[in-house]
């Protein structure tokens, strides 16, 4: 029996269950749990093997939500009506490009990313990441997701910027820049070393958080990974809509920020936010270049006036 049953002191009212539906009916008797907690508890109880349950959960979560988020963008690429919002409207990914990208991403998922997933549950037990029910308070999870976004963005900025130097770009990061006009599926089209390095920011930051605070739930990590997947896919979508998030949150990076990075190959190294590129003057594109040139010109003029 799965150790999730240890959360409760009395299972005398539970009937013998052989199907997931029957297990859920048992958990449905517990009034102190919401529907998501009941589903979560039922899943672990039914699987009866926490290591396998966590590994399968994370693998399926990654596959379902990554490709599920890519699919709408692939459909939009085939509908001419949306071209007016396509940032590089003359560069629509062909079926061949989509297929080649899909094969590479699937290979990476099964041969690079799938293997370490099965070690995550023992790590959870080792450092104290909870997977029991009930879940933490929503306010706690919101704070943690916000912190993870900020810290991951910092990790991504510096390591992504580092991958644009010399041999790191030539032998590792160049693969990701095969598509000068990105599309959703290309979000995880990358060299295995890059997948591991940048992925470490997504997974490693929650681990460090738990080591420091001792307060983290596996459900929080699961939702964080989904949010990060959505952010990455949307940033590579190649579309800028009037309702895009950065039009309401100016510091959010969004597709236009990352599209310019792919178009011009340098600058725009952040993942979720714009502040690192703004502070360190590494924004991409002609507008940013002109801004830097104007700034240099102004500084020269000030210096000349000072020396008169």
Curated annotation (Swiss-Prot):
Pathway: Steroid biosynthesis; zymosterol biosynthesis; zymosterol from lanosterol: step 3/6. A motif (Histidine box-2) lies at residues 173-177. It comes from Candida albicans (strain SC5314 / ATCC MYA-2876). It is found in: Endoplasmic reticulum membrane. Catalyzes the three-step monooxygenation required for the demethylation of 4,4-dimethyl and 4alpha-methylsterols. The third module or late pathway involves the ergosterol synthesis itself through consecutive reactions that mainly occur in the endoplasmic reticulum (ER) membrane. Induction: Expression is induced by fluconazole and in azole-resistant strains. Expression is induced during biofilm formation. Expression is up-regulated when ERG6, CYP51/ERG11 or ERG24 are deleted. The lineage of its organism: Eukaryota, Fungi, Dikarya, Ascomycota, Saccharomycotina. Belongs to the sterol desaturase family. This is C-4 methylsterol oxidase. Keywords: Endoplasmic reticulum, Iron, Lipid biosynthesis, Lipid metabolism, Membrane, NAD, Oxidoreductase, Steroid biosynthesis, Steroid metabolism, Sterol biosynthesis, Sterol metabolism, Transmembrane, Transmembrane helix. GO terms for biological process: ergosterol biosynthetic process. Residues 145-282 form the Fatty acid hydroxylase domain.
């Amino acid at each position: 029996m799965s150790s999730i049953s240890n959360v409760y002191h009395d299972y005398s009212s539970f009937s013998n269950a052989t199907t997931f539906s029957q297990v859920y009916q048992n958990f449905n008797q517990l009034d102190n749990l919401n529907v998501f907690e009941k589903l979560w508890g039922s899943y672990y109880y039914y699987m009866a093997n926490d290591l396998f349950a966590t590994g399968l959960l994370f693998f399926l979560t990654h596959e379902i939500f990554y490709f599920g988020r890519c699919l709408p963008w692939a459909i939009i690429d085939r509908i001419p009506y949306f071209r007016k919002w396509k940032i590089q409207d003359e560069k629509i990914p062909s079926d061949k490009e989509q297929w080649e990208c899909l094969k590479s991403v699937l290979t990476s998922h099964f041969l690079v990313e799938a293997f370490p997933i099965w070690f995550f549950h023992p790590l959870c037990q080792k450092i104290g990441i909870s997977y029991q029910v009930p879940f933490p308070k929503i306010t706690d999870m919101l704070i943690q997701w916000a912190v993870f976004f900020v810290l991951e963005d910092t990790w991504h900025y510096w390591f992504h910027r580092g991958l644009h130097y010399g041999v790191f770009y030539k032998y590792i990061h160049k693969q990701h820049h095969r598509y000068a006009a990105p599309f959703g599926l290309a979000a995880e089209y990358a060299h295995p070393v890059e997948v591991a390095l940048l992925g470490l920011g997504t997974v490693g930051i929650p681990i460090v958080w738990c080591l420091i605070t001792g307060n983290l739930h596996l459900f929080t990590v699961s939702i964080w990974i989904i949010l990060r997947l959505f952010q990455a896919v949307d940033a590579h979508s190649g579309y800028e809509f009037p309702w895009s998030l950065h039009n309401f949150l100016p510091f959010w990076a969004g597709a236009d920020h990352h599209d310019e990075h792919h178009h011009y190959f340098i600058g725009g190294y952040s993942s979720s936010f714009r502040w690192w590129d703004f502070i360190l003057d590494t924004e991409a594109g002609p507008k940013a270049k002109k801004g830097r040139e104007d700034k240099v010109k102004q500084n020269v003029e000030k210096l000349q006036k000072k020396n008169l």
